[in-house]
């Protein structure tokens, strides 16, 4: 799994282990963002974030802020690793 476009293009993203999380495929994210158009300056909400790929893709494409909601500890660890790999800031509540 990788970031499709933007500032983090080509960066590899990790998915949480196990079968409780099913990451959105690269092609699906690419299609979603093609339909959405520009996300520059927008705020993004990623519910049931899993790997955080959707939010990270949005940040890569210029979104101003992303809020990720996830309760699975393994998924949270994957999100943290993915944010660290891209250099995106994390503020946790």
Q: Which sequence ranges carry the predicted segments?
A:
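Class I S-adenosyl-L-methionine-dependent methyltransferase catalytic core
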Residues: 1-93
């Amino acid at each position: 799994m990788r970031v499709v476009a933007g500032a983090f293009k080509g960066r590899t993203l990790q998915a949480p282990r196990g079968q409780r999380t099913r990451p959105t495929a690269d092609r699906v994210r690419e299609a979603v963002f093609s339909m959405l158009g520009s996300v520059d300056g927008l705020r993004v909400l990623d519910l049931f974030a899993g790997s955080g790929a959707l939010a990270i893709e949005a940040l890569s494409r210029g979104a101003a802020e992303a809020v990720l909601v996830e309760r699975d500890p393994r998924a949270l660890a994957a999100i943290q690793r993915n944010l660290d790999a891209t250099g995106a800031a994390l503020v946790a509540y």
